[in-house]
Structures are given as C-alpha cells and as structure tokens.
Amino acid sequence: MDRPFSPSSERNRAPIEQILKRAFAARQNVLEIGSGTGQHACYFSEALPHLRWQCSDRAENLPGIRSWRAHAQRPNMPEPIELDVNQPIWPSSRFDGVFTANTLHIMAWEEVQQLFARLPEVLAPQASLVVYGPFK
C-alpha cells in the first residue's frame, strides 16, 4: 500500500515538535486522537523517543497509519487503535499526554463536545493536552 501523504503535516511538524518537546518533556504515554495519515506520529515518535506514541483514528484511516508505522519501524509506536469520538468504546488505558492536530475544525460541533466530555476517561492525573489547528 502506498503511504497517504499530507503536505500540511510535512509543513507544520517542526513547529509542533518544538511545542511538544516542552509540553511532553515529563510525559511517557501519549494518545494521538485523529492520527490521519500517520505522518506526524512517525516524525514525533522519532523526535521524542522517550514517548510511547499511541495513534488512534477511525477505522478507515488505520491502514494508512499502519503503512507509515511499518515504514518507520519505531519501537515506541505501537499498533494504532480504532477511536471514533462518537462510539462508546474508548481506550481503557490512561495517558499522561493527549495530542490532536487539525481535527477540531473538521469535526461537527457535537463531536468536539463529545471529545472533551470523554477525555477524562483516558487522561491520567496531571496529564497534558495539546491541540493544534485553526480556530475561529
């Protein structure tokens, strides 16, 4: 399978990395919500090797993420998990960091509300949340 490619992910990864280095300096286990192509995960898991970078997305995006993961061969990037904010099943694990990029502005408002309502289920105490994207 060809790896999906997002030009914007390539352009914004370095500036985001600078923020993540500070925000996740003392973190170990990060959940990325809406991993999309998987490009960010591959880049950040290499740039921040102290983090276990858990990708998640809707089922239809998982093959592309798996393709990037297979290409990158990162030991700190486990198999991506299915996560749809509208579905009742969320990860049972707790994460001390959550990251999402370019998701909230494409979600329906009800989905954004659902995301923030459900986040406490996966956040460890004192966890960090980093959201990147355009806002109105």
Where are these regions (language model features)?
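A short beta-strand submotif of the Rossmann-like class I SAM-dependent methyltransferase core
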Residues: 100-103, 109-112
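A short glycine-rich, Lys/Arg-flanked "PGG" loop and its adjoining helix->strand segment in the class I
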Residues: 113-125
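A short acidic, Gly/Pro-enriched loop at the edge of an enzyme's catalytic core
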Residues: 90-98
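Conserved beta-strand signature within the Rossmann-like core of class I S-adenosyl-L-methionine
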Residues: 126-134
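Conserved class I S-adenosyl-L-methionine
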Residues: 27-36
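Class I SAM-dependent methyltransferase SAM/SAH-binding core
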Residues: 31, 42-88
